[in-house]
Swiss-Prot record:
Domain of life: Bacteria
Coiled coil (UniProt feature): none
GO CC terms: cytosol
Organism: Rhizobium johnstonii (strain DSM 114642 / LMG 32736 / 3841) (Rhizobium leguminosarum bv. viciae)
GO BP annotations listed: leucyl-tRNA aminoacylation
Keywords assigned: Aminoacyl-tRNA synthetase, ATP-binding, Cytoplasm, Ligase, Nucleotide-binding, Protein biosynthesis
UniProt name for this protein: Leucine--tRNA ligase 2
Cited InterPro entries: aa-tRNA-synth_I_CS, aa-tRNA-synth_Ia, Leu-tRNA-ligase, Leu_tRNA-synth_edit, M/V/L/I-tRNA-synth_anticd-bd, Methionyl/Leucyl_tRNA_Synth, Rossmann-like_a/b/a_fold, tRNAsynth_Ia_anticodon-bd
Length: 876
């Protein structure tokens, strides 16, 4: 066969068309084979895919193609997480309707994904903004409402007065809205909530069953759920300092053992006592307003300067009524955790210590390490928050912290304040119910109606879907649904009187909390086909970024439980296996400095090696630019590489192979032109080896050698097959690539020999067997090239439909051993030899090694010590 360079621009569209025509990747739910459901987190249709998408979807595609070849009935679908603020921003900034913007972007990104050659079942595609999707989400909402898993209540929210919308805690940065920069206000709004807290303990306990999830993700969820065992303690307010009608403060603590180290109580700015104090004191009122504007995310609380104001209120210590403590309003206490009040033990908590030092409050060490000295132990600038032995704690001295916890809990549970116990054991969770109300247009409408006579009335399921109106305007901030002249006005389903639709839409995290279930039967006229859902769920392998470790993954776990409670699925967990891949990162380039710094795109510079250093220059005028740090690809720093450009220049297989080959999949991959060119050279080399030998190989049937000259070829191929199979099972893509490179090197000479017409039929059959193994090993990563090579060998049918090869057990047995060779105790060489070689054979082979000959330099060894299958030592 005449050898030509492999042309991906010709081959890739041709094979994609063939796969599409043959519907190779469409999945039949009725197929009786064992199922395997692989899913990558579906993308937001921003308009273009980026290299992070390429890596994510290439990984999923390797798994899908490999499992399909192994005989599984594979489900590998794709859709679009299509609701959200960017579409509304585009509507405001460009005057384009969110639906038009979204569907146009979907069209562009779908074409890009198809160009990657992904083995996706596009027949199951949907976007979450499709009415056909969100009508079923409304159905689920109503089912959850009937089951008591949805409720409505007044809730304090972060309100952006410019964007006129609610912000999540994480979207408040230094008291300002993340997008508008406006000072955030605290408002009381009536919001819809999902009762995720009904499942707090179950969500926590079940983490132990998710043994195919990264430990880091499980730990993050465990901490987010935040189970703690503690004590609620009622503190009596000193009557002379008590506001009217108030007599006590309830505190929740996980460390009642440290009560004798208490020096203050701290309450949230929204605590009733704080509100009372603020009403009487303008300074306290201003401080409370400042606290409310600050971010309430965990990160914001941990990094903010600790501030407080003394309310003038005093409380009596629960273990010593003669001991009075001040009550402060503090900016690090939240009303929605515990009781909105804490006691501060400065010696045992760094935050409390910083606060106490700032405001001159006592610091008494009450816990020391077990090996500490009570006479000398003290707390300086660092609190001791560990377990240990009690000191300076009266009747608790000498007890362990665990013993002290129980003694205090028992004593306060037996004591009374008024008509109730002063203390009560309690399990608390950090997890809060999920507020899903958003004051936006581009989201799933909440299917309820508000009637003055009947109250909140669910939309009858027969009247679903509640569709978004198309005729909306974005010429002013706020929710267009509130301003629509007709959409919100309806008749009450109960009494028929005039009523109003709910104008809030659902948080977009709702859309992505059950999409994996819908993929199992997206044609159904109800949310799920339980039979299909129960067959396919849980997802066997879910792949996506670790930035979704908490919210999306936790919400999906809740949703699956809620859908089980309402009869839609039998599964408890949505994802059996989870893999969190690293990012694609790139060097940054810039010109200028400070405020005048201008970022430069990689495509606009060239890199030269001058005086042993890498230097960057603009292509246009040779101006030198600065080479910065390696960072996540981002539009803001222009360190992005367009996948379209890479595919146009090198082909999709090169892009896929590079992002899989250059680093472990859980780590970041550094994009480099040299790395891409190396991947491209590999594809060309593989094609050249196969195509040059194709005529000779197509004339023989593949058969591994059992002895003779070709045995080593078959051993190399079958050992690599076994190893790469294990690598694919464990998602070790970069290790698979390294082994494939080694096999290509091992086959280069035999393939060249066959291409030259040398070797007998047995030899050629062994080479063909090895070549086919090589092609199949690389096919999940470079599927177009593999199809081209497969066809070149004369194979009929698509490789995408072919079964995975089976390795020959007799060929993968390790019959050799590598022995370190020492001369006078210093390692000089290694000897690879048959495991059952006798001592004389080992000795002769060692003396024949070039490294040994050079080291001996003609000397005769005094002694050669052979430790069988371990080591050889030559004494000179």
């Amino acid at each position: 066969m005449a050898t030509e360079r492999y042309n991906p621009r010709d081959a890739e569209p041709r094979w994609q068309q063939k796969w599409n025509e043959d519907k190779v990747f469409e999945t039949d739910n009725a197929d009786p084979r064992e199922k395997y459901y692989v899913l990558e987190m579906f993308p937001y249709p921003s308009g273009r895919i980026h290299m992070g998408h390429v890596r994510n979807y290439a990984m999923g595609d390797v798994v899908a193609r490999y499992k399909r070849a192994r005989g599984y009935n594979v489900l590998h679908p794709m859709g679009w997480d299509a609701f959200g603020m960017p579409a509304e921003n585009a509507a405001m900034e460009r005057g384009v309707h969110p639906a038009s913007w979204t569907y146009q972007n979907i069209g562009s990104m779908k074409a890009q994904l198809k160009a990657m050659g992904l083995s996706l079942d596009w027949s199951r595609e949907f976007a979450t903004c499709d009415v056909e999707y969100y009508q079923h989400q409304q159905h689920l909402f109503l089912d959850f409402l009937e089951k008591g898993l949805v409720y409505r209540k007044q809730s304090k929210v972060n309100w952006d007065p410019v964007d006129n919308t609610v912000l999540a805690n994480e979207q408040v940065i230094d008291g300002r809205g993340w997008r508008s920069g406006a000072l955030v206000e605290q408002r009381e709004l009536t919001q819809w909530f999902f009762k995720i807290t009904d499942f707090s303990q179950d969500l926590l306990d079940a983490l132990d069953t998710l043994d195919q999830w990264p430990e880091k993700v499980r730990l993050m969820q465990k901490n987010w759920i935040g189970r703690s065992e503690g004590l609620t303690i009622r503190w009596e307010i000193v009557p002379e300092t008590a506001p009217a009608g108030e007599s006590e403060v309830t505190v929740y603590t996980t460390r009642p053992d440290t009560l004798f180290g208490a020096s203050f109580l701290a309450i949230a700015a929204d605590h009733p006592l704080a509100k009372d104090a603020a009403a009487k004191n303008p300074e306290i009122e201003a401080f409370c307003d400042e606290c409310r504007r600050a971010g309430t995310s965990l990160a914001a609380l941990e990094t903010a300067e600790k501030k407080g104001m003394d309310t003038g209120i005093r409380v009596r210590h629960p273990l010593d009524p003669s001991w009075e403590l001040p009550v402060y309003i503090a900016n690090f206490v939240l009303m929605d955790y515990g009781t909105g009040a804490i006691f501060g033990c400065p010696s045992g908590d760094q935050r409390d210590l910083d606060f106490a030092r700032k405001y001159g409050l006592p610091v008494v060490a009450v816990v020391m390490p077990r090996d500490g000295d009570a006479a000398s132990f003290s707390v300086g600038d660092t609190a001791y928050d560990g377990d240990g032995v009690m000191i300076n704690s009266r009747f608790l001295d000498g007890k362990t912290t665990e013993e002290a916890f129980n003694i205090v809990a028992d004593r306060l549970s037996a004591a009374s304040l008024g008509n109730a116990p002063q203390g009560e054991r309690k399990v608390n969770f950090r997890l809060r119910d999920w507020g899903i109300s958003r004051q936006r247009y581009w989201g799933c409408p909440i299917p309820v109606i508000h009637c003055d006579d009947c109250g909140v009335v669910p939309v009858p399921k027969a009247d679903l879907p509640v569709k978004l109106p198309d005729d909306v305007t974005f010429d002013q901030p706020g929710n267009p649904l509130d301003r629509h002249p007709t959409w919100r006005h309806v008749s009450c389903p109960n009494c028929g009187k005039d009523a109003r639709r709910e104008t809030d839409t659902m948080d977009t995290f709702v859309d992505s909390s059950w999409y994996f279930t819908r993929f199992t039967a997206p044609w159904e006229d109800k949310p799920t086909d339980p039979e299909a859902a129960n067959r396919w769920l849980p997802v066997d392998q879910y792949i996506g970024g670790i930035e979704h470790a908490i919210l999306h993954l936790l919400y999906s776990r809740f949703f699956t439980r809620a859908m089980r409670e309402t009869g839609h699925v039998a599964a408890t967990e949505p994802f059996k296996g989870l893999f969190t891949q690293g990012m694609v990162v790139h060097e940054t380039y810039s010109r200028g400095a400070g405020a005048s710094r201008e970022w430069v795109a990689p495509a606009d510079i060239r890199i030269d090696e001058l005086d042993g250093k890498r230097r960057a220059f603009l292509l246009t005028n040779n101006e030198e630019v600065s080479i910065g740090s390696i960072e996540k690809m981002s539009k803001s720093k222009k360190n992005v590489v367009d996948p379209d450009d890479i595919i146009a220049s090198y082909g999709a297989d090169t892009a896929r192979f590079f992002v899989l080959s250059d680093s472990p999949p859980e780590r970041d991959v550094i994009w480099s032109e040299a790395g891409v060119e190396g991947a491209h050279r590999f594809t060309q080399r593989l094609w050249r080896l196969i195509s040059e030998a194709a005529d000779a190989l197509s004339a023989v049937a593949p058969a591994p050698a059992t002895d003779g000259e070709a045995l080593s070829i078959s051993q190399a191929a079958h050992k690599t097959l076994k190893a790469v199979q294990n690598d694919y099972d464990k998602l070790w893509f970069n290790k698979a690539v390294a082994r494939i490179y080694e096999l290509v090197n091992a086959l280069a000479a035999p393939m060249t020999k066959v291409a030259a017409g040398e070797g007998d039929a047995t030899y050629r059959a062994a080479v063909r067997d090895a070549a086919e193994i090589l092609i199949q090993l690389v096919s999940p990563m470079t599927p177009h090239l593999a199809e081209e090579c497969w066809a070149a060998l004369g194979n009929e049918g698509l490789l995408a439909r072919a079964s995975w090869p089976q390795y020959d057990e007799t060929l993968v047995i390790e019959n050799s051993v590598v022995l370190p060779v020492q001369i006078n105790g210093k390692k000089r060489a290694e000897l690879t030899i048959s495991r059952d070689a006798d001592q004389n054979t080992v000795t002769d082979a060692v003396l024949d090694l070039d490294a040994v000959k050079n080291a001996l330099n003609g000397q005769a060894p005094k002694k050669i010590i052979v430790v069988p299958q371990r080591i050889v030592n030559i004494v000179v």
